[in-house]
A protein has these predicted regions:
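Peripheral, non-transmembrane regulatory/ligand-interaction domains of membrane transport proteins
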Residues: 1-180, 184, 190-193, 197-202
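Hydrophobic alpha-helical transmembrane segments and their immediately adjacent juxtamembrane loops
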Residues: 16, 22, 199-259
Length: 259
C-alpha cells in the first residue's frame, strides 16, 4: 500500500488523482471547498473521510482558520489532500518517516492518528491565541485603541471557526466509531487518546471564547462610560460658553426697553 500526500494540488496533481488513481471527482471537489463539513462517504472501492484542521494564515483579519483535510483510501492507496500548506501534515509526515512506515499501519489507525494530530494542533494554536489575547489586554489597559480592539475581534472570529470545526470533528469521530470496529487494545487506547485531546481542545476553545466575550463586553462598557463622561463635559462647556451670550442678550434687551 502506498501513501500519497498532496498539498496545494496543481493541475497535474488533479489529473493524476482523478485519471490515474480514479478518485471520484466529487471527493476532490469537496476537499477544495473550504466550507465543506466533516463526514464519511464510500464510492466504488474508495472511502472518503473529510476532517477539519487548523491553519495559521498571514491575514491579520483572520489569523487562524480551519480548512478541509481529505483522506481517500482503498486497498492499494492511502491519499491525503489539502489545498493549503498545513503544519499538521508536515508534522505528521515527519512522525512516520522517523518511526514507522505506512505499510505497518491500518487505515483506521491512521485516521485516528490524524484526528489526534488535528486536536493537538488546535491546542497549539489556541495557546498562541491566548498569548495574543493577553498582549492585546495589556495594551488596552494602557490605552484603548481601535487597533487592539480589532485584534480581539479578529481573534474572536478565529475562535468561532475553531469551535464550529471541533464540534464537527467530534460528530465525525463518534460516527466513525460507530461504523468501524475496534480491533485491539492499542486501537482502543488510541481512540481514548483522541477523545481526550478533542474534548480538551473543545473545552479550551470555549473557555477562551467566554473570556474574550467577557473582555469585549467590559471594554464596550468602558468606552460607553468614557463617552458619557465626554458628553457631560461637552455639555458643561457649552453651558459655560452660553453664559456671556445670555448676559449680553439680557443687557441688550434692557437697553432697548430704556430707549
Amino acid at each position: 500500500r502506498t501513501w500519497i500526500s498532496i498539498e496545494e494540488p496543481t493541475a497535474e496533481d488533479k489529473k493524476f488523482l482523478l485519471e490515474d488513481l480514479k478518485i471520484p471527482a466529487a471527493f476532490y471537489n469537496d476537499i477544495e471547498d473550504i466550507d465543506e463539513r466533516p463526514r464519511i462517504e464510500v464510492e466504488d472501492d474508495w472511502t472518503f473521510v473529510l476532517l477539519r484542521i487548523p491553519h495559521k494564515t498571514t491575514n491579520e483579519k483572520s489569523p487562524f482558520i480551519t480548512v478541509p483535510l481529505g483522506i481517500v483510501y482503498n486497498k492499494n492507496y492511502f491519499v491525503t489532500i489539502t489545498f493549503y500548506k498545513a503544519d499538521l501534515l508536515l508534522d505528521f509526515v515527519n512522525y512516520y518517516s522517523t518511526r514507522k512506515t505506512i505499510e505497518e499501519t491500518d487505515n483506521l489507525n491512521l485516521i485516528l492518528r490524524f484526528h489526534l494530530s488535528a486536536s493537538v494542533w488546535f491546542l497549539k494554536y489556541l495557546k498562541q491565541i491566548n498569548i495574543q489575547i493577553k498582549n492585546a489586554e495589556n495594551d488596552l489597559e494602557r490605552s484603548i485603541k481601535n487597533e487592539d480592539l480589532q485584534t480581539l475581534f479578529n481573534i474572536e472570529k478565529s475562535l468561532v471557526y475553531f469551535n464550529t470545526s471541533l464540534r464537527s470533528n467530534e460528530i465525525l469521530l463518534y460516527r466513525f466509531k460507530s461504523q468501524r470496529k475496534i480491533k485491539n487494545i492499542l486501537e482502543e487506547e488510541l481512540l481514548e487518546d483522541v477523545e481526550i485531546e478533542l474534548k480538551q481542545a473543545i473545552d479550551t476553545s470555549h473557555i477562551f471564547s467566554d473570556i474574550l466575550s467577557g473582555m469585549m463586553d467590559a471594554y464596550a462598557s468602558v468606552i460607553s462610560n468614557n463617552l458619557n463622561v465626554i458628553m457631560k463635559r461637552l455639555t458643561s462647556i457649552s453651558i459655560i460658553l452660553m453664559i456671556p451670550t445670555l448676559i449680553a442678550s439680557i443687557y441688550g434687551m434692557n437697553v432697548t426697553n430704556h430707549l
